[in-house]
Every structure is written in structure tokens, then in C-alpha cells.
């Protein structure tokens, strides 16, 4: 029995030896790739670079993954040119990899070499024709090259390959640049189906509906954006602007107070706060806020415009002239600027230049009856009844055109027009959509004798108030550069400033159009 036991033991030990196997050796080129990846995803870049250095020394510098990760780290450190050279090395080590070419093109894009980036992306597309990121980045490059047709073509192809919100957002912004607001709304709505909690999309759609005058839908989308992100800066400004446009200044100020805690250095925010105080007739507080906005954004003509408007209301005409002239030097295409400048020049007794400013305003805006009304008042007070009659007839034509769109007019403007028509004895045919509270005033004015025709029409204060309500006949408030409210702007524009959103290393950033 003892001998049998002795024979069994060696057999068991032999089995144990056969089960113990040596760990297989990894190829020397990829031995430390797992450790490099581990340090990189943990953002332990110093340790990662140390391991990369050891790996490159051991492999004579031909380890593709080590070079690739080192290039990514250099890009994160802002060394774009050095990262480009390393990515080119990766492309030489593995010329069949589309990922290496995508990173080369990405570095060229970040260096501003968009044409070269397009060439490399096209080469990568030949290696991988079903990569939506290549099509998307080609669309972004063409966007920077101002080739909008090719940009839309590539972005549409990217959406066909893979439905995602990034390409849809960029495509919608291109449609906004082309003025296709309805198409942009449709594109953003489709993108929202892919990403229903995207606050940027919700805010953008809210602003577009606000621009089209669909306040109910605008409020719905903006409310959803604030539900997902209560500190959403653009959403807060847009919601506050809607309340501000309807005269709810206290509620709007409460909204702006929330935004001020997160973005205290926002020029549009302080501009809106200033115009809330202006609506509450707290002119000193309005000027204080507007000057802070001007300090934060000294080349924003809208802030200068609003400062001129407030100074006109305070009868500080020289200061108003100063700010309005500065605004015109920055922006030449706004009729309201020239109209307010003409008012300031009128009070400064510079009649000839005031007439020139009114003529310029009338040539820039063929739809605003307020320009012709104030110009007619000036000519009437200067004794030019024939010229005043011509401007009044132009006023009648514009009012008739606006009446078809059910536009509501400012009561003060209606009252002034009726007084002017009574003085010129031509105002009986003018029908307003919104009458004044005292219709008898018009009858009394119409019954004046001929001897009263040349009496000065409108005091300085009345004319100043007419200017301060320059957009009173339009319910839509102006939105600009971050939803800045402008008292004259009748058509709000979508604030879309250039940003650098956090994207993957192989995806070029989307481009946002800067607003008017």
C-alpha cells in the first residue's frame, strides 16, 4: 500500500506543473499601451508622459499609440503645431488609419488652415466613407471658408449617416445666416427630437418664435429651457425680455437679478436692466446701468443708442447728441439712430442738419411712419407747410400699409398725428387701428381757423416723448447680442455668438454666427 501511495504522489505533482502556464508576453510595441490609456483617461498627464517616454525609448519611437496620446496631450496644453507634427508621424506609421488623418485635419483646423484641413478630411473620407464626423467637420470647414452650399451638403450627409444634434444645430445656424428662419426652426425642431433636454436648442427655438411674434410658443420653449437649467443665462434674458416688452419691469428685474449672480460682467444684461429702469422712468438709475454696460462693451452701438434715448428723455440734448453720434459711427444702417439724432439737433437749434438726419432716416426705413411724423412736425414749426404736407402724405401711405397687418400704434404718436393733420387740414382720411382716449380733441383741433395754422405744433417735451416711444407701434422688442433690448429695433435678431463648445478630440467645433 505504501508503494502505491508513493507512485500516486509524483503523478499529482506532474499535473500541477502542467497546469501552471507562463503569462504570454505582449509585443514590445504595445506592452505599455494599457498603462498609457489608464493614465490618460484619469487625466494624470505627467505620469502618462513619463510612461510614453519609456515606451518610445524602448520601441525606437515607432509606437503609434504612444505618439498618438502624446499628441493629444500636447494639443490639450495648447501646443497645436507640435501636436500636428506628431499626428503626421502617426499617419506615416499607419497610413491606412482614417483616425490619424482626422486628427491631422483637426490640428490644421485649430491653426486656422481650413483649406488644408479640407484636403486632409477628403483624404480621410476616401479611407472611411461612412464616418459622419468627417462629413460634419468638412461642413464646419466649408462654413469658415464661406462656402455655405458645400457646408450644407456635407452637414446633410452627416445627418444621413448618423442622426445627431450637433450637425443639425450647425445646419440650422447656416439657414439663419441665409435668412431662412422657417427652415431653421424646422431643423432645430428635428434636432430637439434627438436631444430633448438640450437647453441651447430650447433657448434658440424660443428666441426664433419670439422673433416671429409667437409669444406663447416662445414662452413654452424658454420655460422648458429654464426647467432643465434654471441658471441658463440666455433663457433668463429672453424670458426677462418678453416680460419687459409687455411692461412687467419688476418681474423682468427679478429675472435679471438671477442672471446677474452668475454673469455679472454681461453687457446685454446691464443694458436690459437699464432699459427696465428707463421704463419705470428712473432715468438716473438707467444711465448708471447703461454706462456700466458701455464699460463692459464699449463698441456696442445699441448701448450708445439707449444712452442717447435716456438723455433725450432727460432733456440733456448735448449728451444725447454725443452718444447718438458715437452709435452712428459704429452702425450706419439704423434709421432710428438718425431720427433721434435729428431730434437732438432740433433742440440744439441746428435745423439744417436735423433735416438731413430726417432725410437719411426716411431713406433707410421705408415703413416707419414715426420718421415722417417727426419730420413733418419740424417742417411745420419752421413754416414749411408744403414740405410738412408731403411728409404727412407719406405718413398716411405707411399707416395704410401697416394697418393691413393689424399693427397697434403708440397713443402719443396717434395724438400727435391727429393734431398735425388738423393743423394741415388733411387728417380726416387717416384711420388708425388704435384711437386716442379723447376723440373730441381731434374735432376741436380740426375746427381751428386758418389763423392758427402756423402755431408751433408740439412742445419740446412732447417731441421728446414721441422719440422715446420710437418703436411704440410695434409690440416686438429688439433682441441683440445676448438678447439686449433696444427701444427702436422692431425686428429682434437671434443672438448667436461664436463659442468653443467642448467636443471630442476628432470633432471640429461648431460655428455660431455673431448677431447684427
Curated annotation (Swiss-Prot):
The record ties this protein, via SUPFAM superfamilies, to: TPR-like
Which stretches does UniProt call biased (Low complexity)? 492-506
Q: Which GO terms describe its biological process?
A: centrosome cycle
Q: Where in the cell is it found?
A: Cytoplasm, Cytoskeleton, Microtubule organizing center, Centrosome; Cytoplasm, Cytoskeleton; Cell projection, Cilium membrane; Cytoplasm, Cytoskeleton, Microtubule organizing center, Centrosome, Centriolar satellite
Where are the residues of the annotated region Disordered?
A: 431-516
Any one Gene Ontology molecular-function term assigned to this protein's record: protein-macromolecule adaptor activity
Keyword Membrane applies: yes
**Pfam families linked to this entry:** TPR_16, TPR_19, TPR_8
Q: Which GO terms describe its cellular component?
A: centriolar satellite; centrosome; ciliary membrane; cilium; cytoplasm; pericentriolar material
> Is Lyase among this UniProt entry's keywords?
no
Q: Where are the TPR repeats?
A: 64-97, 98-131, 133-165, 166-198, 200-232, 234-266, 267-300, 302-334, 336-368, 370-402
Q: Where is the composition biased (Polar residues)?
A: 477-490
Q: What is its main location?
A: cytoplasm
User: Which UniProt keywords are present, listed alphabetically?
Assistant: Cell membrane, Cell projection, Cilium, Cytoplasm, Cytoskeleton, Membrane, Repeat, TPR repeat
Coiled-coil portions: none
Q: What does this gene product do? A: May be required for the dynein-mediated transport of pericentriolar proteins to the centrosome. Required for microtubule anchoring at the centrosome but not for microtubule nucleation. Required for ciliogenesis.
Subunit architecture: Part of BBSome complex.
* Protein family: Belongs to the BBS4 family.
- Protein's recorded name: BBSome complex member BBS4
Name the gene for this chain.
bbs4
